[in-house]
């Protein structure tokens, strides 16, 4: 299928938002705005929806700040459940643009894999990661691209993170049922 993408630098391009909002044929991936608040980015999504296209996926791709060093951006994946709670929109995480490099952590995992797991465990619905057969030859985003031979490893790691999320979700459901039983008055009281 086809999905339109509005990148971070166009999140406040209101003429573009109007045009894309009026075209209901394709869903839209709207990335969080560059240098604006979460609320301002969510308002851009609302602007799109008000023009008629409510098939919006909200993209988190990190925030530009010096607190992100040594990564390109400060990872904002703690906002995954916040966006879902406030809007009910599906959420896409973009670990490649958040991290911006292929650095490997001391445990052997790539930073982008750690960040991907964070977003998935937080409940992300979609992941956008850069892959390239020869990252050094890529015209854009080469330094952050994973290689094609790394794809099976990446997908297995994603499956592990997803299983952890599902376990956590089931635990929350069980606790909610337990709390509901405790809150119900007993017959004959």
For each feature predicted by the language model, list its residue ranges.
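Short, electropositive alpha-helical surface patch
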Residues: 113-115, 143-156, 181-188
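C-terminal helical cap(s) of enzyme catalytic domains, especially alpha/beta-barrels
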Residues: 134-167
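Catalytic alpha/beta core domains of metabolic enzymes, predominantly
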Residues: 12-131
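Surface-exposed amphipathic alpha-helical tracts and adjacent flexible/coil segments at the periphery
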Residues: 155-189
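Flexible glycine/acidic-rich beta-alpha junction loops that bind and position SAM and/or redox cofactors
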Residues: 66-68, 101-103, 133-142, 171-182
């Amino acid at each position: 299928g086809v999905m339109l993408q509005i990148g971070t630098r166009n999140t406040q391009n209101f003429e573009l938002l109007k045009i894309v909002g009026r075209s209901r044929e394709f869903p839209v991936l709207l990335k969080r705005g560059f240098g604006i608040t979460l609320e301002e980015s969510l308002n851009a999504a609302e602007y799109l929806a008000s023009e008629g296209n409510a098939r919006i996926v909200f993209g988190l791709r990190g925030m530009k700040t010096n607190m992100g060093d040594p990564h390109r951006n400060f990872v904002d994946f703690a906002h995954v459940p916040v966006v879902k709670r406030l809007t009910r929109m599906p959420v896409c995480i973009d670990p490649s643009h958040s991290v911006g490099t292929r650095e490997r952590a001391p445990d052997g995992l790539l930073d982008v894999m750690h960040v991907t797991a964070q977003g998935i465990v937080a409940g992300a619905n979609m992941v956008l990661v850069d892959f390239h057969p020869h990252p050094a030859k890529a015209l854009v985003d080469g330094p952050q691209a994973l290689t094609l031979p790394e794809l099976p490893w990446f997908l297995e790691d994603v499956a592990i993170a997803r299983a952890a999320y599902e376990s956590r979700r089931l635990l929350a459901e069980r606790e909610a049922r337990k709390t509901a039983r405790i809150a119900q008055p007993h017959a004959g009281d």
